Swiss-Prot record:
Function, as annotated: Positively regulates the activity of the minus-end directed microtubule motor protein dynein. May enhance dynein-mediated microtubule sliding by targeting dynein to the microtubule plus end. Required for nuclear migration during vegetative growth as well as development. Required for retrograde early endosome (EE) transport from the hyphal tip. Required for localization of dynein to the mitotic spindle poles. Recruits additional proteins to the dynein complex at SPBs.
UniProt xrefs under PANTHER family: WD REPEAT DOMAIN 5B, WD40 REPEAT PROTEIN
Major localisation: cytoplasm
Protein family membership: Belongs to the WD repeat LIS1/nudF family.
Placement of WD repeats on the sequence: 113-154, 156-196, 200-243, 246-285, 290-350, 352-391, 396-448
Protein name: Nuclear distribution protein PAC1-2
Keywords (A to Z) from UniProt: Cell cycle, Cell division, Coiled coil, Cytoplasm, Cytoskeleton, Microtubule, Mitosis, Repeat, Transport, WD repeat
One GO term (biological process): microtubule sliding
Length: 453
């Protein structure tokens, strides 16, 4: 057998083993090895032995670290190879096309200041501000372009679980919800002063979203809670105007449709529910069943995705772009993502994550769905290619990823000139909104990451 080590390397290894055995009180074994290797006290005394005591352990741990690094690099190489294989001259030439842009490593910024898990984030619809909420009970406001912390908001007494910017144009507010069972409203125009605190839930409030005004005079907010209910609030009056009951477990997430008529909720009861809040006494219009564990997140498909979702559903033509709540997506602790149609039928199950799915967002261009999970990855699924996973950011975070958001689009100049509507962005036609190539994630590693073109 040809020796792998040189004579000097072998001598170093032998001395390291003897020193390790001696340091761990295995004197009999050490003495036997000394005798077989001719390393008696006259050659390898106590002083020299002490110099080698920790060498074997250091070598061992360095090998483990190198192995992990090699595995990470191999995973990254596979992801890059996959991206390269599926790139064509046409797709490469469209890299600057926002409808085909996907986030890639490294992130533009890694924002660090929170002292505990970061649970949520939200982009300001107009300015380069981003808000994040954490288990440290604070909300932090950042300038995502500069990567700098602007201010820290204190008021909640327990973990901040979700946040959202919204309200009519010119009067945008920030809403936050917490394990302290409250929702707080903050005014960005007045140095983020806490203007109102909404109480009424009997458990942690896990999700909060502004709803497009219906009619224009109203300012609505919806919340989801561990008390198994959803609540709709009039933020001007500060009152709960509707309580929606139907879930039999903790309601983990809720999102409004673009027109504000429908809500999509999901929870630990393994169901997703569609609600029509325009009804005087709303009940769940649809119950989606199919996941094998709790559903952590949900999302409405934008009209831009209808052509791809319709193909997945086997439809000859897509629904009209003016309709809402035609297709939906849910992410679960069963590690899968399910796509649903308006009848509550699962049209596709996306498999690839190795742990709980914690966040979903549809690409504004409509062709892709992005997801994050406790497997520390961000994945991109091509809805126009049978939902195939076409990109994986394996190094998105060092620990579980808790949230994923895509920055809202910017209304093109002149798109709403002369219009009386001063409502939120969702009321603007998709063709009049410029896509921003800007995505952010949060994690158990206490970091907010910005992925931008």
């Amino acid at each position: 057998m040809n020796p792998v080590l040189t004579s000097r390397q072998a001598d170093e290894l032998h001395k390291s083993i003897v020193a390790y055995l001696t340091a761990n009180n295995l004197s009999t074994t050490a003495a036997t090895l000394r005798e077989e290797l001719s390393l008696g006290e006259d050659v390898f005394d106590a002083e020299k032995t002490a110099k080698y005591q920790s060498l074997l352990e250091k070598k061992w741990t360095s090998v483990v670290r190198l192995q992990k690094k090699v595995m990470d690099l191999e995973s990254r190489s596979v992801a890059l190879q996959s991206e390269l294989e599926h790139s064509t001259p046409a797709s490469l030439s469209k890299r600057k096309d926002p409808t085909s842009w996907l986030p890639r490593s490294p992130p533009r910024h890694s924002l660090e200041s929170h002292q505990a898990i970061v649970n949520c984030l939200a982009f300001h619809p107009v300015f380069s501000s981003l808000a994040s909420g954490s288990d440290d009970s604070t909300v932090k406001i950042w300038d995502w372009e500069l990567g700098e912390l602007e201010r820290t908001l204190k008021g909640h007494t327990r973990a901040v679980l979700d946040i959202d910017f919204g309200g009519p144009r010119g009067a945008i507010l920030l809403a936050s919800c917490s394990s302290d069972s409250t929702i707080k409203l903050w005014d960005p125009a007045d140095e983020y002063k806490n203007t109102r605190t909404l109480t009424g839930h009997d458990h942690s409030v896990s999700a909060v979203r502004f709803v497009t005004s219906r009619p224009r005079s109203e300012n609505l907010l919806v919340s989801a809670s561990g008390d198994k209910t959803l609540k709709v609030w009039d933020i001007t009056a500060g009152y709960c105007i509707k309580t929606l009951q139907g879930h039999t477990g903790w309601v983990r997430d809720v999102v409004p449709s673009l027109d504000g008529r429908f809500l999509l909720s999901s929870g630990t009861d393994q169901t997703a529910r569609l609600w029509d809040i325009s009804a005087a006494d709303p009940e769940s219009k649809l119950v989606m069943v199919g996941h094998e564990n709790g559903i952590r997140c949900c999302a409405f498909a934008p009209p831009a995705s209808y052509v791809h979702m319709a193909a997945l559903a086997g439809l000859k033509k897509p629904p009209p772009s003016t309709s809402t709540a035609e297709f939906m997506a849910t992410g679960s602790r069963d590690k899968t993502i399910k796509l649903w149609n308006s009848t509550g039928t699962c049209i596709k199950t996306l498999v690839g994550h190795d742990n709980w799915v914690s966040g979903l967002v549809f690409h504004p261009g409509g062709k892709y769905l992005l997801s994050v999970a406790d497997d520390k990855t961000l994945r991109c699924w091509d809805l126009g290619d049978d939902g195939r996973c076409v990109k994986v950011l394996a190094d998105a975070h060092g620990q579980f990823i808790t949230c994923l958001r895509w920055a809202p689009g910017i209304v093109k100049k002149g798109a709403d000139q002369g219009a009386e509507d001063t409502g939120p962005l969702e009321k603007t036609a998709p063709s009049e909104v410029q896509i921003r190539c800007l995505v952010a994630t949060t994690s158990v590693d206490k970091v907010v990451r910005i992925f931008a073109d």
